Amino acid sequence: VKVFDDDINKLRIIQQVLGQGLFTSTFHPNVLHNAFRSADVVIGAMRYINTRHRYIIATDLVRTMKKGALVIDLRVSQGGCFETTCCLSREDPAVFEQYGVLHYCKLNISNRVARTTSMAYSNIFVPLLLSLGDAGSVQGMIK
């Protein structure tokens, strides 16, 4: 497993939580190229704050992947993480092959696994709500 992000602090936290054995890196072109070339599965889950600072995985990187490898775009409903998936519509098939690489791009994938999504949301929101309760108000929590 290799995790890429543009925020070094997030990458450090991921390593602290999951262990030093996990490979993390920023979006360095050479490192990405080597990772894509050897990957069996690539999952795109990048969240965009605004469209000016979008990072989209180029078609050239997808072309370097092994035949039969799989790309899963979890952000296709927000515009997609990959050039090869970003122009899909609801009528397009969820699974298709491009450049010998399988692509799974289903709008609202999290709706397909409602229980897992609910647990993930609980892991995010329960600590926030507990902190809010301890602080007494949103303003108190912000301070």
Each language-model region and where it sits:
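Metallocofactor- and cofactor-centric catalytic cores in central/energy metabolism, strongly enriched
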Residues: 25-28, 37, 41-47, 67, ...
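Predominant activation on well-ordered alpha-helical scaffold segments within soluble catalytic domains
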Residues: 11-15, 40, 59, 63, ...
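Adenosine-phosphate binding glycine-rich loop
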Residues: 76, 80-143
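Short, well-ordered secondary-structure micro-motifs
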Residues: 14, 36, 55, 83-85, ...
